[in-house]
């Protein structure tokens, strides 16, 4: 009888711990989604304010440039469409999100300097800090998915492509400033999509269509 009670106690403790871990993971996922949503909204606000500050002819010229431009993230392996995104594992989506956020930590310093003080976007110098916080959160989620298993993804140890890709952009170069902002918005949209799908995929009953 005593052994049965001990066994029951251990089972209850295990259930309690597992439920607590699941609850904490959900909180971290929700927090990560909220953080990247804010960054995506901030990116959209920045580029909208930037475009509003341009002359009509400048705006028309820039609208033809970006679709043909190359972003740093284009060298980071990632799903190329909705179907591929939905078929990707939670761990893969988290790893890609981590790489994308990491790729902006250093260039975000240039991003802050590119933005005119006259633009009403708040304090752009906080972008680097927000990216660093999100990176830490995603790292914790990745460790949770690994559940103690070694990280076998070789891409995690690879250097980021073109680390100084955005750092040569001059503050007075209209085309390159727009390119910087447009790439930032594009990448934050990617990360938001990947984290939303990853969060949804954790619930088997959820409809994770994009």
Swiss-Prot record:
GO terms for molecular function: growth hormone activity; growth hormone receptor binding; metal ion binding. GO terms for biological process: animal organ development; growth hormone receptor signaling pathway; positive regulation of growth; positive regulation of receptor signaling pathway via JAK-STAT; response to nutrient levels. Keywords: Disulfide bond, Hormone, Metal-binding, Secreted, Signal, Zinc. It comes from Misgurnus mizolepis. GO terms for cellular component: extracellular space. Residues 1-22 form the signal peptide. It holds the Pfam family Hormone_1. Belongs to the somatotropin/prolactin family. The gene is gh. It is found in: Secreted. InterPro entries: 4_helix_cytokine-like_core, Somatotropin, Somatotropin/Prolactin, Somatotropin_CS. Zn(2+) binds at residues 38, 192. Disulfide bonds join 71-183, 200-208. This is Somatotropin. Growth hormone plays an important role in growth control and is involved in the regulation of several anabolic processes. Implicated as an osmoregulatory substance important for seawater adaptation. The keyword Signal applies.
